[in-house]
UniProtKB/Swiss-Prot annotation:
It comes from Homo sapiens. Its main location: nucleus. This is Cell cycle checkpoint control protein RAD9A. CDD domains: PCNA (cd00577). Component of the toroidal 9-1-1 (RAD9-RAD1-HUS1) complex, composed of RAD9A, RAD1 and HUS1. The 9-1-1 complex associates with LIG1, POLB, FEN1, RAD17, HDAC1, RPA1 and RPA2. The 9-1-1 complex associates with the RAD17-RFC complex. RAD9A interacts with BCL2L1, FEN1, RAD9B, ABL1, RPA1, ATAD5 and RPA2. Interacts with DNAJC7. Interacts (when phosphorylated) with TOPBP1. Changing residue 328 to A: Complete loss of phosphorylation and no loss of interaction with the 9-1-1 complex.
Length: 391
Protein backbone atom coordinates (compact mmCIF):
# COMPACT_ATOMS: atom_id res chain seq x y z
CA UNK A 1 0.00 0.00 0.00
CA UNK A 2 1.17 3.49 -0.84
CA UNK A 3 -0.60 6.84 -0.70
CA UNK A 4 0.42 10.48 -1.02
CA UNK A 5 -1.38 13.35 0.74
CA UNK A 6 -0.66 16.94 -0.25
CA UNK A 7 -1.64 20.49 0.69
CA UNK A 8 -4.34 21.12 3.26
CA UNK A 9 -5.39 17.46 3.27
CA UNK A 10 -2.36 16.71 5.46
CA UNK A 11 -3.92 18.74 8.26
CA UNK A 12 -7.30 17.06 7.67
CA UNK A 13 -5.65 13.67 8.09
CA UNK A 14 -3.96 14.88 11.27
CA UNK A 15 -7.26 16.16 12.70
CA UNK A 16 -8.84 12.78 12.01
CA UNK A 17 -6.07 11.03 13.93
CA UNK A 18 -6.56 13.44 16.85
CA UNK A 19 -10.29 12.64 16.91
CA UNK A 20 -9.63 8.91 16.93
CA UNK A 21 -7.11 9.28 19.75
CA UNK A 22 -9.95 10.44 22.05
CA UNK A 23 -11.53 6.99 21.81
CA UNK A 24 -9.05 4.14 21.54
CA UNK A 25 -5.44 3.24 22.25
CA UNK A 26 -4.96 1.26 19.02
CA UNK A 27 -5.40 2.31 15.41
CA UNK A 28 -6.60 -0.17 12.80
CA UNK A 29 -5.34 0.79 9.34
CA UNK A 30 -6.88 -1.01 6.38
CA UNK A 31 -6.34 -0.14 2.70
CA UNK A 32 -9.47 -0.80 0.64
CA UNK A 33 -10.42 -0.36 -2.96
CA UNK A 34 -12.81 2.38 -1.83
CA UNK A 35 -10.10 4.23 0.08
CA UNK A 36 -7.99 4.17 3.22
CA UNK A 37 -9.85 3.21 6.39
CA UNK A 38 -8.78 4.32 9.89
CA UNK A 39 -10.69 2.73 12.77
CA UNK A 40 -10.51 2.43 16.52
CA UNK A 41 -12.53 1.15 19.46
CA UNK A 42 -12.21 1.83 23.18
CA UNK A 43 -11.27 -0.79 25.73
CA UNK A 44 -14.83 -1.29 27.00
CA UNK A 45 -16.23 -1.68 23.47
CA UNK A 46 -18.70 1.16 24.10
CA UNK A 47 -17.36 3.54 21.44
CA UNK A 48 -16.32 2.89 17.85
CA UNK A 49 -15.04 5.33 15.24
CA UNK A 50 -14.17 5.01 11.57
CA UNK A 51 -12.86 7.39 8.90
CA UNK A 52 -12.83 6.35 5.26
CA UNK A 53 -10.76 8.57 2.96
CA UNK A 54 -11.72 8.22 -0.70
CA UNK A 55 -9.03 7.75 -3.37
CA UNK A 56 -9.72 11.32 -4.56
CA UNK A 57 -8.52 12.55 -1.16
CA UNK A 58 -4.99 11.49 -2.11
CA UNK A 59 -2.84 12.71 -4.92
CA UNK A 60 -1.70 9.13 -5.35
CA UNK A 61 -3.37 6.03 -3.90
CA UNK A 62 -2.55 2.36 -4.39
CA UNK A 63 -4.26 -0.14 -2.11
CA UNK A 64 -1.96 -3.04 -3.01
CA UNK A 65 0.61 -3.97 -5.58
CA UNK A 66 -0.59 -6.26 -8.38
CA UNK A 67 -0.73 -9.85 -7.24
CA UNK A 68 -0.56 -8.95 -3.54
CA UNK A 69 -3.33 -9.30 -1.00
CA UNK A 70 -4.65 -6.33 0.91
CA UNK A 71 -2.90 -5.83 4.23
CA UNK A 72 -4.54 -5.03 7.55
CA UNK A 73 -2.48 -3.77 10.43
CA UNK A 74 -2.85 -2.51 13.98
CA UNK A 75 -0.51 0.06 15.52
CA UNK A 76 -0.38 1.96 18.77
CA UNK A 77 -2.36 5.18 18.68
CA UNK A 78 0.39 7.10 20.49
CA UNK A 79 2.94 6.09 17.86
CA UNK A 80 0.83 7.25 14.94
CA UNK A 81 -0.34 10.35 16.81
CA UNK A 82 3.25 11.46 17.36
CA UNK A 83 3.61 11.95 13.61
CA UNK A 84 0.73 14.45 13.54
CA UNK A 85 1.20 15.85 17.03
CA UNK A 86 1.47 19.52 16.07
CA UNK A 87 -1.33 20.57 13.73
CA UNK A 88 0.15 24.04 13.38
CA UNK A 89 3.41 22.54 12.16
CA UNK A 90 1.56 20.42 9.61
CA UNK A 91 -0.18 23.46 8.20
CA UNK A 92 2.87 25.74 8.05
CA UNK A 93 5.81 23.50 7.16
CA UNK A 94 4.58 20.16 5.74
CA UNK A 95 3.98 20.15 2.00
CA UNK A 96 3.10 16.49 1.51
CA UNK A 97 2.88 13.22 3.42
CA UNK A 98 3.70 9.79 2.03
CA UNK A 99 2.39 6.66 3.79
CA UNK A 100 3.56 3.20 2.74
CA UNK A 101 2.89 -0.21 4.23
CA UNK A 102 5.47 -2.95 3.77
CA UNK A 103 4.35 -6.39 4.86
CA UNK A 104 7.77 -8.02 4.55
CA UNK A 105 9.46 -5.64 6.99
CA UNK A 106 6.37 -5.17 9.18
CA UNK A 107 6.87 -1.44 9.10
CA UNK A 108 4.53 1.43 8.43
CA UNK A 109 6.61 4.24 6.96
CA UNK A 110 5.35 7.82 7.18
CA UNK A 111 7.42 10.49 5.44
CA UNK A 112 6.75 14.20 5.91
CA UNK A 113 8.15 16.38 3.14
CA UNK A 114 8.65 19.82 4.68
CA UNK A 115 9.79 23.13 3.30
CA UNK A 116 13.43 23.78 2.37
CA UNK A 117 13.91 20.11 1.45
CA UNK A 118 13.55 18.75 4.99
CA UNK A 119 12.24 15.19 5.30
CA UNK A 120 11.04 13.47 8.45
CA UNK A 121 10.73 9.70 8.32
CA UNK A 122 8.83 7.66 10.92
CA UNK A 123 9.15 3.85 10.92
CA UNK A 124 6.32 2.40 12.99
CA UNK A 125 6.00 -1.27 13.85
CA UNK A 126 2.60 -2.90 13.45
CA UNK A 127 0.79 -6.19 13.96
CA UNK A 128 -1.34 -8.12 11.51
CA UNK A 129 -4.98 -8.21 12.54
CA UNK A 130 -8.47 -8.96 11.35
CA UNK A 131 -10.78 -6.31 10.00
CA UNK A 132 -12.46 -4.23 12.70
CA UNK A 133 -16.07 -3.56 11.83
CA UNK A 134 -19.06 -2.55 13.96
CA UNK A 135 -22.56 -3.64 13.00
CA UNK A 136 -24.85 -0.62 12.78
CA UNK A 137 -27.48 0.78 10.44
CA UNK A 138 -28.34 4.50 10.63
CA UNK A 139 -31.45 3.97 8.50
CA UNK A 140 -33.01 1.79 11.22
CA UNK A 141 -33.01 4.61 13.79
CA UNK A 142 -36.39 6.40 14.07
CA UNK A 143 -34.92 9.72 15.27
CA UNK A 144 -32.48 11.85 13.33
CA UNK A 145 -30.96 15.33 13.69
CA UNK A 146 -28.78 17.15 11.18
CA UNK A 147 -27.06 20.46 11.78
CA UNK A 148 -23.79 22.23 10.97
CA UNK A 149 -21.02 21.07 13.27
CA UNK A 150 -20.36 24.69 14.21
CA UNK A 151 -23.83 24.98 15.80
CA UNK A 152 -23.37 21.87 17.92
CA UNK A 153 -19.80 22.83 18.77
CA UNK A 154 -20.93 26.15 20.20
CA UNK A 155 -23.69 24.36 22.14
CA UNK A 156 -21.27 22.06 24.01
CA UNK A 157 -18.73 24.82 24.62
CA UNK A 158 -20.18 25.90 28.04
CA UNK A 159 -19.99 22.36 29.45
CA UNK A 160 -17.15 21.58 31.84
CA UNK A 161 -14.21 19.62 30.38
CA UNK A 162 -14.51 17.25 33.35
CA UNK A 163 -18.12 16.35 32.50
CA UNK A 164 -18.38 12.70 31.48
CA UNK A 165 -21.86 12.38 29.99
CA UNK A 166 -24.36 14.73 28.39
CA UNK A 167 -28.08 14.25 27.71
CA UNK A 168 -29.50 15.12 24.30
CA UNK A 169 -33.27 15.35 24.02
CA UNK A 170 -36.26 17.03 22.45
CA UNK A 171 -38.11 19.39 24.78
CA UNK A 172 -41.28 21.43 24.56
CA UNK A 173 -41.75 23.38 21.38
CA UNK A 174 -39.43 20.92 19.56
CA UNK A 175 -36.39 22.50 21.11
CA UNK A 176 -33.20 20.44 21.08
CA UNK A 177 -31.76 20.45 24.60
CA UNK A 178 -28.29 19.52 25.79
CA UNK A 179 -28.04 19.05 29.56
CA UNK A 180 -25.21 17.91 31.79
CA UNK A 181 -25.81 14.47 33.29
CA UNK A 182 -24.83 13.39 36.81
CA UNK A 183 -25.46 10.04 38.45
CA UNK A 184 -27.95 9.92 41.31
CA UNK A 185 -25.49 8.37 43.75
CA UNK A 186 -22.80 10.92 43.00
CA UNK A 187 -21.76 13.50 45.57
CA UNK A 188 -24.25 16.31 45.98
CA UNK A 189 -21.52 18.90 45.53
CA UNK A 190 -20.87 17.61 42.02
CA UNK A 191 -24.51 18.25 41.13
CA UNK A 192 -24.51 21.80 42.41
CA UNK A 193 -24.46 23.25 38.89
CA UNK A 194 -26.46 21.88 35.97
CA UNK A 195 -25.64 23.26 32.53
CA UNK A 196 -28.35 23.28 29.88
CA UNK A 197 -28.31 24.61 26.33
CA UNK A 198 -31.39 24.96 24.12
CA UNK A 199 -31.38 25.08 20.32
CA UNK A 200 -34.37 26.04 18.23
CA UNK A 201 -35.75 23.94 15.42
CA UNK A 202 -34.61 26.57 12.93
CA UNK A 203 -30.95 25.82 13.81
CA UNK A 204 -31.22 22.33 12.30
CA UNK A 205 -31.30 21.36 8.67
CA UNK A 206 -33.40 18.33 9.52
CA UNK A 207 -35.19 17.42 12.76
CA UNK A 208 -37.04 14.13 12.82
CA UNK A 209 -37.74 13.25 16.44
CA UNK A 210 -40.63 13.24 18.89
CA UNK A 211 -40.89 15.48 21.91
CA UNK A 212 -39.74 13.83 25.13
CA UNK A 213 -37.14 11.46 23.65
CA UNK A 214 -33.65 11.72 25.13
CA UNK A 215 -30.37 9.83 25.18
CA UNK A 216 -27.25 10.14 27.32
CA UNK A 217 -23.79 9.48 25.89
CA UNK A 218 -20.12 10.30 26.51
CA UNK A 219 -19.17 13.90 25.88
CA UNK A 220 -15.45 13.34 25.31
CA UNK A 221 -15.90 11.27 22.15
CA UNK A 222 -18.63 13.60 20.91
CA UNK A 223 -16.32 16.58 21.24
CA UNK A 224 -13.64 14.77 19.26
CA UNK A 225 -15.97 14.29 16.30
CA UNK A 226 -17.26 17.86 16.56
CA UNK A 227 -13.72 19.21 16.51
CA UNK A 228 -12.95 17.41 13.26
CA UNK A 229 -16.27 18.18 11.57
CA UNK A 230 -16.10 21.84 12.55
CA UNK A 231 -12.58 22.27 11.17
CA UNK A 232 -13.68 20.68 7.88
CA UNK A 233 -16.92 22.75 7.83
CA UNK A 234 -19.11 19.66 7.57
CA UNK A 235 -22.64 18.85 8.67
CA UNK A 236 -23.20 16.32 11.46
CA UNK A 237 -26.07 13.84 11.52
CA UNK A 238 -27.20 12.12 14.73
CA UNK A 239 -29.23 8.92 14.47
CA UNK A 240 -30.61 7.45 17.68
CA UNK A 241 -33.29 5.18 19.08
CA UNK A 242 -34.50 4.50 22.62
CA UNK A 243 -32.15 4.91 25.62
CA UNK A 244 -29.79 1.98 25.83
CA UNK A 245 -29.51 1.64 22.06
CA UNK A 246 -26.33 2.93 20.36
CA UNK A 247 -26.32 6.40 18.85
CA UNK A 248 -24.72 6.89 15.44
CA UNK A 249 -22.97 10.13 14.48
CA UNK A 250 -22.11 10.52 10.80
CA UNK A 251 -20.35 13.06 8.60
CA UNK A 252 -20.22 12.72 4.84
CA UNK A 253 -18.29 14.46 2.11
CA UNK A 254 -17.17 13.68 -1.40
CA UNK A 255 -13.66 12.95 -0.11
CA UNK A 256 -14.32 11.23 3.22
CA UNK A 257 -16.91 9.56 5.44
CA UNK A 258 -16.93 9.42 9.22
CA UNK A 259 -18.95 7.24 11.59
CA UNK A 260 -18.93 7.34 15.37
CA UNK A 261 -21.03 4.79 17.28
CA UNK A 262 -21.47 5.55 20.99
CA UNK A 263 -23.28 3.57 23.64
CA UNK A 264 -26.11 5.31 25.53
CA UNK A 265 -27.35 4.92 29.08
CA UNK A 266 -30.59 3.05 29.64
CA UNK A 267 -31.75 4.86 32.82
CA UNK A 268 -32.43 8.35 31.47
CA UNK A 269 -36.24 8.23 31.65
CA UNK A 270 -36.38 10.06 34.97
CA UNK A 271 -34.03 12.75 33.69
CA UNK A 272 -35.76 13.30 30.35
CA UNK A 273 -39.43 13.36 31.33
CA UNK A 274 -39.33 17.08 32.10
CA UNK A 275 -36.48 18.01 29.77
CA UNK A 276 -36.25 21.72 29.34
CA UNK A 277 -38.54 22.68 32.26
CA UNK A 278 -36.59 24.36 35.08
CA UNK A 279 -39.58 24.05 37.44
CA UNK A 280 -38.60 20.50 38.29
CA UNK A 281 -35.60 21.75 40.27
CA UNK A 282 -37.58 24.06 42.59
CA UNK A 283 -38.38 22.76 46.12
CA UNK A 284 -42.15 23.26 45.77
CA UNK A 285 -43.23 20.40 48.10
CA UNK A 286 -41.10 21.78 50.96
CA UNK A 287 -42.64 25.20 50.53
CA UNK A 288 -46.17 23.82 50.83
CA UNK A 289 -45.26 22.04 54.05
CA UNK A 290 -44.86 25.37 55.89
CA UNK A 291 -47.59 27.43 54.30
CA UNK A 292 -50.20 27.08 51.59
CA UNK A 293 -50.44 30.50 50.00
CA UNK A 294 -52.55 31.38 47.03
CA UNK A 295 -50.69 30.66 43.75
CA UNK A 296 -50.66 34.38 42.97
CA UNK A 297 -49.21 35.43 46.33
CA UNK A 298 -45.59 34.97 45.23
CA UNK A 299 -46.05 37.37 42.34
CA UNK A 300 -46.05 40.29 44.79
CA UNK A 301 -42.35 39.75 45.60
CA UNK A 302 -42.74 40.93 49.20
CA UNK A 303 -40.23 40.35 51.97
CA UNK A 304 -42.28 37.64 53.70
CA UNK A 305 -42.45 35.41 50.63
CA UNK A 306 -38.73 35.98 50.01
CA UNK A 307 -37.85 34.83 53.52
CA UNK A 308 -40.18 31.82 53.29
CA UNK A 309 -38.40 30.76 50.10
CA UNK A 310 -35.05 31.14 51.85
CA UNK A 311 -36.21 29.04 54.74
CA UNK A 312 -37.27 26.19 52.46
CA UNK A 313 -34.08 26.19 50.44
CA UNK A 314 -31.69 25.94 53.40
CA UNK A 315 -33.92 24.09 55.81
CA UNK A 316 -32.15 20.82 55.06
CA UNK A 317 -28.83 22.12 56.34
CA UNK A 318 -29.84 21.36 59.93
CA UNK A 319 -27.88 22.99 62.68
CA UNK A 320 -24.93 24.05 60.56
CA UNK A 321 -23.31 27.13 62.03
CA UNK A 322 -23.50 30.13 59.75
CA UNK A 323 -20.55 32.52 59.61
CA UNK A 324 -21.16 35.60 61.63
CA UNK A 325 -20.98 38.83 59.65
CA UNK A 326 -21.00 42.17 61.37
CA UNK A 327 -23.68 44.35 59.82
CA UNK A 328 -24.30 46.69 62.73
CA UNK A 329 -25.59 50.14 61.77
CA UNK A 330 -23.53 53.26 62.26
CA UNK A 331 -23.63 55.42 65.38
CA UNK A 332 -27.01 56.93 66.07
CA UNK A 333 -28.01 59.66 68.54
CA UNK A 334 -29.32 58.23 71.81
CA UNK A 335 -33.03 58.28 72.32
CA UNK A 336 -34.58 58.78 75.69
CA UNK A 337 -36.83 55.90 76.67
CA UNK A 338 -40.43 56.90 76.85
CA UNK A 339 -43.70 55.18 77.52
CA UNK A 340 -44.63 55.31 73.88
CA UNK A 341 -41.53 53.36 72.77
CA UNK A 342 -41.99 50.77 75.50
CA UNK A 343 -45.51 50.12 74.31
CA UNK A 344 -44.25 49.64 70.78
CA UNK A 345 -41.55 47.20 71.96
CA UNK A 346 -44.12 45.18 73.85
CA UNK A 347 -46.51 45.16 70.93
CA UNK A 348 -43.90 44.22 68.34
CA UNK A 349 -43.75 40.45 69.05
CA UNK A 350 -47.49 40.19 68.57
CA UNK A 351 -47.35 41.50 65.02
CA UNK A 352 -46.31 38.13 63.51
CA UNK A 353 -48.20 35.42 65.40
CA UNK A 354 -48.38 32.02 63.80
CA UNK A 355 -45.54 32.64 61.30
CA UNK A 356 -42.42 31.23 62.97
CA UNK A 357 -40.31 30.73 59.80
CA UNK A 358 -40.51 34.38 58.60
CA UNK A 359 -39.94 35.68 62.14
CA UNK A 360 -36.99 33.36 62.55
CA UNK A 361 -35.21 34.56 59.40
CA UNK A 362 -36.12 38.17 60.02
CA UNK A 363 -34.22 38.04 63.27
CA UNK A 364 -31.39 36.08 61.65
CA UNK A 365 -30.78 38.12 58.47
CA UNK A 366 -32.44 41.44 59.21
CA UNK A 367 -32.24 41.65 63.00
CA UNK A 368 -29.94 44.65 62.93
CA UNK A 369 -32.65 46.82 61.37
CA UNK A 370 -35.92 45.17 62.36
CA UNK A 371 -35.33 44.19 65.97
CA UNK A 372 -33.17 45.45 68.85
CA UNK A 373 -29.77 43.78 68.96
CA UNK A 374 -28.94 42.17 72.29
CA UNK A 375 -25.25 41.41 72.51
CA UNK A 376 -24.47 38.16 74.40
CA UNK A 377 -21.09 39.50 75.51
CA UNK A 378 -22.41 41.20 78.67
CA UNK A 379 -22.74 44.89 79.49
CA UNK A 380 -20.81 47.33 77.39
CA UNK A 381 -17.83 49.04 79.05
CA UNK A 382 -18.40 52.37 80.81
CA UNK A 383 -17.02 55.17 78.70
CA UNK A 384 -17.79 58.08 81.09
CA UNK A 385 -18.21 58.40 84.84
CA UNK A 386 -21.57 59.11 86.41
CA UNK A 387 -22.29 62.74 87.01
CA UNK A 388 -22.33 64.01 90.58
CA UNK A 389 -25.94 65.02 90.29
CA UNK A 390 -27.10 61.42 89.97
CA UNK A 391 -27.10 59.63 93.27
Amino acid sequence: MKCLVTGGNVKVLGKAVHSLSRIGDELYLEPLEDGLSLRTVNSSRSAYACFLFAPLFFQQYQAATPGQDLLRCKILMKSFLSVFRSLAMLEKTVEKCCISLNGRSSRLVVQLHCKFGVRKTHNLSFQDCESLQAVFDPASCPHMLRAPARVLGEAVLPFSPALAEVTLGIGRGRRVILRSYHEEEADSTAKAMVTEMCLGEEDFQQLQAQEGVAITFCLKEFRGLLSFAESANLNLSIHFDAPGRPAIFTIKDSLLDGHFVLATLSDTDSHSQDLGSPERHQPVPQLQAHSTPHPDDFANDDIDSYMIAMETTIGNEGSRVLPSISLSPGPQPPKSPGPHSEEEDEAEPSTVPGTPPPKKFRSLFFGSILAPVRSPQGPSPVLAEDSEGEG
